[in-house]
Swiss-Prot record:
Keyword Disulfide bond: no
Entry keyword Cytoplasm: yes
Name of the protein this chain belongs to: Sulfur carrier protein FdhD
UniProt-annotated location(s): Cytoplasm
Lineage, uppermost ranks: Bacteria, Bacillati, Bacillota, Bacilli, Bacillales
Gene: fdhD
Length: 267
């Protein structure tokens, strides 16, 4: 298991009507501050694993950089809780103006305000392909595979899981206390390793909010599967960006919300 992902604490568990003293596994949560070109830029609250991937995915998805090649150096100071990033160029004026040491909680991502609206317009583009085709059985199988491999969630109940997949199965999986962070870790891994995202989809454990759909669009995937529900704004954005959303994948049942052409609905 990746180190630092969970801890434990003694608790009282009420079981079969009786209190029992046990050691209970708890998901770890830690603030990590991104320092870009020597200046504090943002603090992310996250599971302290795959931090370089998370930082790279965050920078690209938020429009600070366009590619991993724009990162000159990146290193982690575990003791102080910093990710030091030196870029090949200064941050543009829009991001400099909004560089106010933003604090991003694990549950809801960052404060959106004007910064992200401009960033989203720049980085969340309409999907241009419809190459991913699934049937209901594929959706059930991929979600089952995600849940079977969600070992930290099984032990703690305290993390979200996200995976990059094809029709045939999961390719890469990441977990984090923050839904957005799990996706940034996936994206950062692909960027660092030059992995093609063509024909890939996202399998996700959490709620499909507007911000999650925007993350999926920025990654470049045309379809997202989730065991949870969407919001109305998320579905509006998914339709605008031609992203297929499938939610409530549970007990051999699922809902196809947007762009159903990628899902074979007939049995």
């Amino acid at each position: 298991m990746e180190k630092n992902i969970q801890t434990s604490r003694q608790i009282w568990r009420f079981q079969a009507g009786e209190p029992v003293r046990i050691d209970d596994p708890i998901a770890r949560e830690q603030p990590v501050t991104l320092k870009i070109n020597g200046e504090e830029f943002a603090t992310l609250v996250c599971t302290p694993t795959y931090l370089q991937e998370m930082a790279i995915g965050f920078l690209v998805s938020e429009g600070l950089i366009q590619a991993y090649e724009e990162v000159k150096t990146i290193w982690i100071d575990d003791r102080q809780g910093f990710i030091h990033i030196e870029l090949v160029r200064p941050i543009d004026r829009l991001h400099q103006h909004l560089q106010t040491k933003r604090y991003m909680g694990s549950c809801c991502g960052m404060s959106r305000q004007g910064f992200v609206f401009a960033s989203d317009a720049k980085t969340a583009k309409k999907v241009q392909t419809r190459d991913v085709k699934l049937n209901a059985g594929d959706c059930f199988r991929l979600m089952a595979e995600l849940q079977e491999n969600a070992r930290t969630f099984q032990q703690t109940g305290g993390v979200h899981n996200a995976a990059l997949a094809t029709k045939d199965g999961l390719l890469l999986m990441r977990e984090d206390v923050g839904r957005h962070n799990a996706l940034d870790k996936l994206y950062g891994h692909c960027l660092q390793n030059g992995l093609s995202l063509h024909g890939k989809l996202v399998v996700f454990s959490g709620r499909l909010s507007a911000e999650i759909i925007l993350k999926v669009a920025k990654i470049g995937c045309e379809l997202v599967l989730s065991k949870s529900a969407p919001t109305d704004r998320a579905l509006q954005i998914a339709e605008e960006l031609d992203i297929t959303t499938v939610g409530f994948i549970r007990n051999r049942s699922m809902n196809v919300y947007t762009v159903p052409e990628r899902i074979e609905l007939k049995s």
